[in-house]
Amino acid sequence: MVQNPYQNALLPAPVGGGYSDPDYWIWCGSVVQGEDGAYHMFASRWPKDLGFGANWLFNCEIVRASSKNPEGPYTFQEVVLGRRGRTFFDGMNVHNPYIRKWNQTYYLYYMGTTFGGPIPGPGDEVDSSRFTEVWNRKRIGLATAPSVFGPWTRCDEPLISPRDCSHWDCTATTNPAVAIQPDGTTYMLYKSRSFADGPLKIGVAKAPRPDGPFERILDDPIFNFEDPNIHLEDPYLWYEDGKFRLLIKDDFKNGGPGINGIWGAGLYAESAGCIHWEFAENPVVYSRHVTWSDGRQTDQANCERPYFLLDENNHPTHLFLATGEGPAPYQFSRTWNMVIPLR
């Protein structure tokens, strides 16, 4: 039986920590210690006047913010990836940054997409058919740099694309989560589904180097459930003490029980080879209920896109989460990336 080493590992979240910007919706958040000794967060953002809604898919860019310590607050430094033209697979929108460093090179994995037609502006509604069309164009991309400060070189082709419609992952490839071994062998988890509003599932691929070529090592998703209301997304993958380890969001639908009955919770699982996974007996690492450094306790509208900062032994020291305030999930007054130190 798998035990959860992070079941009671979270310390209070620093008030004012993480990364926020009053003029932007902030989402995602992936942190690495740079060659300068500072901590650098790669996050997603889009202008506040556009609304939260669908604009993470139409008007998002990836930025870098930095702090002298892991808790922050992080200060905006630059736009790292933005629009580059409709002819590129990632030319109109980028999201889901996931940063790794190996052999003196920084690898920034992300989701990119493109679309035709008008770019949504303030007050514009995006109907469900257009949203689904662009959602299905999501592909996993990669940018590399010799320094956390750049310059960044973007790959012109996706690292992994959907398969034909005889497979479960025929719509999109998105939400990359990557673990790089010392010899450069790289494992990637990705999200997909077989039809609009179908169950969100996770696949696995492997490459000899962090930049590919990636080949699937399992034809099926890493988890299969009979209940179509069980959705899993936002994987975070790492390798520690001879095991692959996973933190993933329980995103169950239609009032179903999910894996553990707590919607939006982050769940822990382990695997010997990144193929056959087992959830811990008590899998919850975090939920939307947060304890803050000033003693307050709140129920956040969302806590998503989990990312562990790892030390030199690949052991997690801090948990980063995209979060927001509001009366219900995705009904936000503001969003930011928060940080929770671990015991």
Feature map (PLM): residue ranges:
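Carbohydrate-active catalytic/glycan-binding domains of CAZyme proteins
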Residues: 1-343
